[in-house]
Amino acid sequence: MSKVFIPEGYRAPLSVYELQRAIEFIKSNFQTNLSNALNRRRVSAPLFVEEASGLNDNLNGYERPVSFDIPDVHAEAQVVHSLAKWKRLALKRYQFNVGKGLFTDMNAIRRDEEVDNLHSIYVDQWDWEKVIAREDRNTDYLKRTVRDIVGAVCETNDALGVAFPSLHTKLDRDVFFITTQELEDMYPDKTPKERENEILRQHHTVFLMQIGGKLKSGKPHDGRAPDYDDWDLNGDILMWNPVLQCAFEISSMGIRVDENSLDRQLTLAGCDDRRSLPFHKMLLNGELPLTMGGGIGQSRLCMLMIGACHIGEVQSSIWDRATTDACRDAGILLL
């Protein structure tokens, strides 16, 4: 069922031709800014992984991966949901040292995504991962990295405004940090998404920390798989979307689990069966580097900076009939 929302009086900010130019500009400029900010090396990434490897992201635990068999190699493969675990293994295989990292273009299919203005079954991200020292597994280090990423985003937005003077999106470089428990304490009677909207109305750039574990209410703010982020050292970068008047996630990131936090989180999540998978065995045995990483939505960033009201304006995907009809009637072209 369609959940599309068209703001009253909305008109596409650019022609289709100029839109493509702007998308190209954002992706090229931000990739350079991100690489400079985080000292990353670009690498090639897989579109699919072997099911038995345990490398795919289980997301919230109920999403079904797109799967297919490969007769010639006698294996079942899955199109990736994300590269969170693959990147960590790649850092070991490619022999990256502390302070060095990688980034890559990640393309995923999330078939069970509930599509709306912000969500598509097609996910495109800049994925990054960095080797860190054990003493860097702390909140201060996490916050410094968040500020670096937000700075790169704002630099690209400033450059876009010069290249395309008709675009006027303003982004706030000043990051407000708050934990999910602090946010629940502020708005105990609201849903997690309503809480995000409330805090983003006050602070237009927020890093919402500690996502995955249960809060005092007995529920987590949002789902996170237990085997990549440390739930005490992760979060989402949220920015205010002036077109849709809502909180707008541009990045999910965090310091990754070590052997101790993985052991604890697998038990809390009821996922002890994963301990026998190759990736998880290596991690529990301390054979993988300590890392932090995340993903930054490419279409999300384009949508925000350009001022589009629907993610289908900046990426090509498949939509339900009600959504395509509503957008057509409003003069919105879905790619």
Give the label of every model feature segment.
Residues 47-51, 165-172, 322-324:
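A glycine-rich phosphate-binding loop feature that marks nucleotide/adenosyl-phosphate handling sites
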Residues 100-102, 123-127, 203-205, 245-247:
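Extracellular structured ligand-interaction cores
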Residues 34-41, 149-160, 309:
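A generic secondary-structure signal for well-formed alpha-helical elements
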Residues 2-119, 129-131:
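Class II aminoacyl-tRNA synthetase-like tRNA-binding/catalytic domains
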Residues 68-70, 92-98, 118-120, 195-201, ...:
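A general structural signal for short secondary-structure junctions and capping/turn motifs
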Residues 18-25, 29, 137-144, 148, ...:
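Generic recognition of stable, solvent-exposed alpha-helical segments in well-folded globular domains
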Residues 109, 180-335:
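A translation/RNA-centric and nucleic-acid-associated enzymatic feature enriched
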Residues 104-190, 194:
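Extended, charged alpha-beta segments that form solvent-exposed binding/catalytic grooves
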